[in-house]
Amino acid sequence: MIALIQRVKRADVRVGERVTGEIGPGLLALVCAERGDTEAAADKLLAKVLGYRVFSDAAGKMNLPVSNLDGAGRAGGLLLVSQFTLAADTNSGLRPSFTPAAPPDEGERLFDYFVRRARERHPIVATGEFGADMQVSLVNDGPVTFWLQTRA
């Protein structure tokens, strides 16, 4: 599985005019399931997303995870948005191939599992809508962006 995480001051996702999810300071994670991914891969990726130290401590060093973004135990928001295009094969030609992405039904199942597990482990979780045409707005903080990828 893949997650492109961005440290944000705030972010929201809309389907049409309806806001489906929004957060204040925290992480926006664009999430993609690849062919052959499993729940174990999702769990491994979630642990990495929640534990990745991208927030600055008192010394200004990136040393704090989203669960403790201020060093005093305050959790930041986690906005999860499905994005199958992260699995694109761009090695040949000028048109991406999405063969590496999980089929839609499997991608939705794994994304839903990822969201469910995130809600069990983190207090502030918002989401987009799987398969919808979404508009994502964010204010990058840094910017700080990381590509995380796991295999089961």
From Swiss-Prot:
Function, as annotated: An aminoacyl-tRNA editing enzyme that deacylates mischarged D-aminoacyl-tRNAs. Also deacylates mischarged glycyl-tRNA(Ala), protecting cells against glycine mischarging by AlaRS. Acts via tRNA-based rather than protein-based catalysis; rejects L-amino acids rather than detecting D-amino acids in the active site. By recycling D-aminoacyl-tRNA to D-amino acids and free tRNA molecules, this enzyme counteracts the toxicity associated with the formation of D-aminoacyl-tRNA entities in vivo and helps enforce protein L-homochirality.
HAMAP family tied to this protein: Deacylase_Dtd
Full protein name: D-aminoacyl-tRNA deacylase
Principal location: cytoplasm
One of the GO biological process terms: D-amino acid catabolic process
Domain notes per entry: A Gly-cisPro motif from one monomer fits into the active site of the other monomer to allow specific chiral rejection of L-amino acids.
Phylogenetic placement of the source organism: Bacteria, Pseudomonadati, Pseudomonadota, Betaproteobacteria, Burkholderiales
Species, as recorded: Burkholderia mallei (strain ATCC 23344)
Motif (Gly-cisPro motif, important for rejection of L-amino acids): 142-143
